[in-house]
Amino acid sequence: MDITKHTRALFVTTMLALGILVAGVAIGACGDDDGAAGEGAAQTAVGNGIDRAFVADMTPHHRSAVQMAKIAERRGQRRFVKDLASDISRTQNAEITTMQRIASRLDAAGVKAASLGIPEHQMGMDTDLSKLRTADPFDRAFIDMMIPHHQAAIRMGHVELAKGSSAEAKRLAKQIIAAQTREIEAMNKHRSEEFGGPSPAGGVPAQDENEGGEGDDGMSSKDHG
């Protein structure tokens, strides 16, 4: 038997086996990387902590606006206020439904709420509905209460646009900003015409207000679930 030929054949066979083994390990590793990348992409597509905070904070904020609008539909003294209240109620109820859908998707993906970074006093949630029910003149009181409420929603929308990642939440934020910007301008115009000047709350907030906030992993002080 030719020992040299046998040794060479054994060497070649061994190297081929090692090559197949290495290739298999490499393919497996690539598969793991692809899986991890896929999971990461899916998470990004669903949204991040800012998206979750945006819908968590905006949903009760919208409900508060709808409550105010319902009072205005009954007590409004001028057609402008009654029509505006009806529009707010219809639009924001529809947006609440959209936010609930977004929240369900984020919750299913395990996304936890971060913080929008907006001070509590700028969130527009300190509305006194009992005071509004007895206000006189009602229309002026309604405008003076709804404008800061809208300002808060616009601030939240700007944070979502700056730091959120959900395409659907961003579309909603743009929609909210556009609608409530128009409404603030219309309310101040009406107040100036009927009551001698715009609301002391001011006008549309600047875009760069409160676009900060914690990162995606920063938890809100509220437990949004």
Placement of each model-derived feature along the sequence:
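Bacterial N-terminal signal peptides that target proteins for export
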Residues: 3-16
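Hydrophobic alpha-helical membrane segments, chiefly transmembrane helices and signal peptide h-regions
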Residues: 17-24
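C-terminal motif of bacterial Sec signal peptides marking the signal peptidase cleavage site
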Residues: 25-29
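All-alpha RGS (Regulator of G-protein Signaling) helical domain and cognate RGS-like helical scaffolds
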Residues: 31-225
